[in-house]
Design a protein with these regions (language model features):
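Short, flexible loop/turn segments with low-complexity composition
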Residues: 180-189
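Active-site phosphate/pyrophosphate-binding segments
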Residues: 170, 188-243
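N-terminal export/assembly segments and adjacent metallocofactor-ligating motifs
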Residues: 1-179, 192, 197, 218-222
C-alpha cells in the first residue's frame, strides 16, 4: 500500500491509492502556486520503457504546463554521444554484441557487464574462456576480474575520477613505444590530426610514472596493460556509464 505523511517529522501512514494520488497532486499544485509553473519537472530512468517515458513527459507538458522533462538516456549518454560523433562521425558505438566473438583482447571500463548486461556478460565470459585476454579498468573488483574459469590479465583499480589520466597514460605508452598501427591510421584517420595528438600524448606528464600518484595504478601494471592491448590482436573496448 502507498504511504504518506504531512511533515518529515511525522511517521508514515498507509492509505489507499485514491488518497495517495490526491495527496501528491495537491502538494505538487501547491508547489507551483507558491513557486511558479516551472518549479515542477520530471526525469525518467533507464529502467523506464519508452511508453513510460512518453507518459511522464506528457504529464509534465500538459498537466504542469512546462517542458522541464528529461531522461537518463540523454543525460547519461550525451557526453559519449557527442565524443563518438566528433571522433567517428556517428554518435553510436562502432561494435555490436557479436564483435566480442572476434576479439582477442578486451578492455572493460566503467561497466559491469555480468550484473548490468548479463546476456552480453555471458558471451564475453565465453570468449574469455576460449582464450581472449581481458583488461578491467574499474575502482571496484567486479565479477569479471576473477570468477570461475576466467581471470582478467590486468585490473587497473584506478581512483574514481581518474579515467582520463589512465587512458592517456595507456595512449602514451602505445605512441612512445611505437605500438600503434601507422598504416591503419594513415589510411583510415586524419594523419595530420594524429600527429598533433601524438605530440600531445607523448609529453612525459602523461606517462604512467607521472600519473601513478594521481590514479593509484602502478606504472608497471599500466604499461603491461597498454602493451597487451596494442599487441594482442583484435582489440575491443566496452564502456559503460561509469565513464
Amino acid at each position: 500500500s502507498p504511504m504518506i505523511r504531512d511533515r518529515i517529522d511525522q511517521p508514515w501512514r498507509e492509505v489507499g491509492w485514491d488518497e495517495a494520488i490526491a495527496f501528491a497532486a495537491t502538494r505538487l499544485r501547491d508547489i507551483q502556486a507558491r513557486h511558479g509553473v516551472r518549479s515542477i519537472g520530471g526525469i525518467t530512468s533507464s529502467r523506464c520503457t519508452n511508453e513510460e517515458t512518453y507518459l511522464v513527459q506528457k504529464l509534465i507538458r500538459q498537466v504542469f504546463g512546462n517542458n522541464n522533462t528529461d531522461t537518463c538516456a540523454r543525460v547519461c549518454h550525451s557526453p559519449t554521444g557527442y565524443r563518438l560523433r566528433t571522433t567517428f562521425g556517428t554518435s553510436a558505438g562502432t561494435q555490436d554484441f557479436d564483435s566480442v566473438e572476434h576479439s582477442d583482447v578486451v578492455i572493460v571500463i566503467g561497466a559491469n557487464p555480468t550484473d548490468a548486461h548479463p546476456v552480453f556478460g555471458s558471451r564475453l565470459k565465453q570468449r574469455l574462456r576460449q582464450g581472449a585476454k581481458l583488461i578491467v579498468i574499474d575502482p571496484r573488483r567486479i565479477d569479471l576480474v576473477r570468477s570461475p574459469h576466467i581471470e582478467a590479465a590486468h585490473h587497473l583499480a584506478l581512483r574514481p575520477g581518474t579515467n582520463v589520466a589512465v587512458v592517456s597514460a595507456m595512449a602514451h605508452v602505445i605512441v612512445t613505444e611505437g605500438l600503434h598501427d601507422e598504416g591503419f591510421i594513415r589510411t583510415r584517420c586524419d594523419w595530420d590530426e594524429f600527429q598533433h595528438y601524438a605530440a600531445f600524448i607523448a609529453d612525459p606528464r602523461h606517462s604512467p610514472e607521472a600519473t601513478e600518484a594521481l590514479t593509484g595504478v602502478p606504472a608497471a601494471t599500466l604499461r603491461a596493460a597498454a602493451r597487451l592491448f596494442a599487441t594482442g590482436g583484435n582489440g575491443a573496448i566496452y564502456y559503460g556509464l561509469g565513464v
